[in-house]
From Swiss-Prot:
Catalysis: reaction(s): ATP + H2O = ADP + phosphate + H(+)
Tele-methylhistidine modification, residue list: 74
InterPro entries registered for this protein in UniProt: Actin, Actin/actin-like_CS, Actin_CS, ATPase_NBD
Keywords, sorted A to Z: Acetylation, ATP-binding, Cytoplasm, Cytoskeleton, Hydrolase, Methylation, Nucleotide-binding, Oxidation
GO molecular function: ATP binding; hydrolase activity
Modified residues annotated as Methionine (R)-sulfoxide in this record: 45, 48
Cellular location(s): Cytoplasm, Cytoskeleton
E.C. number: 3.6.4.-
Positions carrying N-acetylcysteine: 2
Protein name: Actin, cytoplasmic
Modified residues (N-acetylaspartate): 3
Taxonomic lineage of the native organism: Eukaryota, Metazoa, Spiralia, Lophotrochozoa, Mollusca
SUPFAM superfamilies the record matches: Actin-like ATPase domain
């Protein structure tokens, strides 16, 4: 089915960023925003080659004149036409490959609706004519990337956060928890609390500036109340940031108030458990015999786990919830921003995986539903 010399393509479609590259590589070649932009204004310069839509970095750089849309919301594809544009851009512009010559490994959110998975399969075979494809669950790939087959993955990206317990390579669906609170919500919250400080950020373009502030300056406090005290009495926690127009803004307690929402969703007006409690609840839904292995192998993954201080805080919070003698270990690999992609790269290059691909022939015989039989 697969010639040894043809590298498989690995595409991790996140709500915020798309990561793509070749199986066997240790990092994705292309990382670009999962954005499709359409002009807000009529083009007036004839012959400038203005397009009716822009994808990724190009959409990002022309954001001032475009309306930006994210086709993946909360980890699940909501706009298939735009998604197709993103895949087209991935293959032809970013990786510069012909998809009909390579097997493609795609990733999906845990608990992805069945119809979504079928639609992905259909587009790959019918629109892009791939010779073979596979759909893998993101959290499972993150665990592979950490060199484990058992553990619980707390995966938090831009659109959604999941806690996924995995035992001997199988995700335990009954214990998967989903929290619709992730990077994009934190960016929106930071926009809101910066507005209270008197800075105004409203447009989709300005939101990207705030996202940058979040990524560069925010951190998780080990003790939130204590940190608030420190911030109110001294200026030691203040940092400044230069906006694109040269204006400099100062931020203080917003630096840790923003990511604190992951532990206290009530900050966003949400009646949900924080990431520590969600992780604990997930573990408690598993068989009592495997909990010990999960506590000792709690793996963080995704861009929203990149805040400094998050691992220590998780350790502290889960220790407080768990039985007193339990050994708790939080694993935060430095490359966790891309661990889903790295796990996909590892999986797709394993010799034992080669018979797992769904081939074009199998698809033609069975149709899109083949994906439920072959990918689990």
């Amino acid at each position: 089915m697969c010639d040894e010399d043809v590298a498989a393509l690995v595409v991790d479609n996140g709500s915020g960023m798309c990561k793509a590259g070749f199986a066997g590589d240790d990092a994705p070649r292309a990382v670009f925003p999962s954005i499709v932009g359409r002009p807000r204004h009529q083009g007036v310069m004839v012959g400038m080659g203005q397009k009716d839509s822009y994808v990724g970095d190009e959409a990002q750089s022309k954001r001032g004149i475009l309306t930006l849309k994210y086709p993946i919301e909360h980890g699940i594809v909501t706009n298939w036409d735009d998604m197709e544009k993103i895949w087209h851009h991935t293959f032809y512009n970013e990786l510069r490959v012909a998809p009909e010559e390579h097997p493609v490994l795609l990733t999906e959110a845990p608990l992805n609706p069945k119809a979504n998975r079928e639609k992905m399969t259909q587009i790959m075979f019918e629109t892009f004519n791939t010779p073979a494809m596979y759909v893998a669950i993101q959290a499972v790939l993150s665990l592979y990337a950490s060199g484990r087959t058992t553990g619980i993955v707390m995966d938090s990206g831009d659109g959604v956060t999941h806690t996924v317990p995995i035992y001997e390579g199988y995700a335990l669906p009954h214990a998967i928890m989903r929290l619709d609170l992730a990077g994009r919500d934190l960016t929106d919250y930071l926009m809101k609390i910066l507005t209270e400080r008197g800075y105004s950020f409203t447009t989709t373009a300005e939101r990207e500036i705030v996202r940058d502030i979040k990524e560069k300056l925010c951190y998780v406090a080990l003790d939130f109340e204590q940190e608030m005290q420190t911030a109110s009495t001294s200026s030691s926690l203040e940092k400044s940031y230069e906006l694109p127009d040269g204006q400099v803004i100062t931020i203080g307690n917003e630096r840790f108030r923003c990511p604190e929402a992951m532990f206290q969703p009530s900050f966003l007006g949400m009646e949900a458990a924080g990431i520590h409690e969600t992780t604990y609840n997930s573990i408690m839904k598993c068989d009592v015999d495997i909990r010990k292995d999960l506590y000792a192998n709690t793996v963080l993954s995704g861009g929203s786990t990149m805040f400094p201080g998050i691992a220590d805080r998780m350790q502290k919070e889960i220790t407080a919830l768990a039985p007193p003698t339990m050994k708790i270990k939080i694993i935060a690999p430095p490359e966790r921003k891309y661990s889903v992609w790295i796990g996909g790269s590892i999986l797709a290059s394993l010799s034992t995986f080669q018979q797992m691909w769904i081939s074009k022939q199998e698809y033609d015989e069975s149709g899109p539903s083949i994906v439920h039989r072959k990918c689990f």
